[in-house]
């Protein structure tokens, strides 16, 4: 079913955006599935949803970003989401990417080294194109020990 959604999105093209609020929240929930095939299909579908004419369409990607913050339940799913962001977010230069900031910060504090590594790469990429102000503001809302650690990473 998930693969079919991706194929339909691919065929429909950028007009698929009008269905994002209905379909994407349900698709994103699958990032936590225990079956690797389901998780892989989920990210393939998400890519087909946002990539048209061989480029990420920021007008489609940006509205779906908020759905990820409630979907991530494990370190493994956080890693995969951050990796997907690393591949897709560069197309959003100059746009509002604030919905992913808490996810990136959680990734920086994650217990899993691979998750921290991809979060650090994503943060570095983001900070070359966007201001660190929103990251610092969000980090300040965390526990003092976490806020201090995050501030060091952000600056």
Enumerate the language-model features and the residues they cover.
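Extended, low-complexity, acidic/polar intrinsically disordered regions
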Residues: 1-155
């Amino acid at each position: 079913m998930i693969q079919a959604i991706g194929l339909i999105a691919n065929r429909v093209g950028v007009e698929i955006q009008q269905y994002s609020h209905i379909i994407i929240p349900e698709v994103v929930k699958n990032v936590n599935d225990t079956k690797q095939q389901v998780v892989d299909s989920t990210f393939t579908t998400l890519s087909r949803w946002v990539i048209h004419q061989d480029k990420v369409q920021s007008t489609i990607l940006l509205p779906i970003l908020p759905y990820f913050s409630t979907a991530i339940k494990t370190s493994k799913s956080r890693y995969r989401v951050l990796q997907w962001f690393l591949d897709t977010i560069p197309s959003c230069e100059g746009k509002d990417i604030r919905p992913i900031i808490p996810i990136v910060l959680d990734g920086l504090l994650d217990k899993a080294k691979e998750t921290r590594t991809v979060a650090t790469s994503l943060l570095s990429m983001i900070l070359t194109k966007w201001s660190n102000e929103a990251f610092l503001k969000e980090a300040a809302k965390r526990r003092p020990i976490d806020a201090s650690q995050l501030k060091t990473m952000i600056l």
